[in-house]
């Protein structure tokens, strides 16, 4: 993930002259990147319903797409993957309901 985040940061700070999918997404900003995240999330859910080994492979690939596009969004906002890892580590061992309540979430029952 660190290597991917480095590439995203480089594309953001030094847009390449040659075509780059990451640079294209970054130019589109939150709207374009967000559209892809929503699209990929739906594909993850669809793949999760597919049976057997082929379904498993499809789920892995779609999840990789979702993580990739999420990483681009993070990079667009100058957030490193290590910050996400730190937040996940902070939450480890805490009930999801308790964690949501600590944020003052109105939807702590979700």
Task: Go through the PLM ranges and name each one.
Residues 1-63, 67-110:
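Flexible "arm" and connector segments at domain edges
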């Amino acid at each position: 993930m660190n290597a991917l985040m480095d590439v995203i940061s480089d594309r953001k700070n030094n847009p390449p002259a040659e075509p780059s999918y990451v640079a294209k997404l970054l130019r589109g900003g939150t709207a374009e990147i967000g559209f892809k995240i929503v699209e990929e999330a739906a594909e993850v859910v669809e793949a999760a319903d597919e049976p057997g080994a082929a379904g498993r492979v499809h789920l892995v690939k779609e999840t990789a797409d979702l993580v990739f596009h999420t990483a681009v969004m993070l990079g667009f906002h100058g957030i490193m993957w290590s910050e996400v890892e730190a937040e996940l580590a902070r939450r480890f061992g805490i009930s999801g309901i308790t964690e949501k309540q600590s944020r003052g979430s109105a939807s702590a029952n979700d």
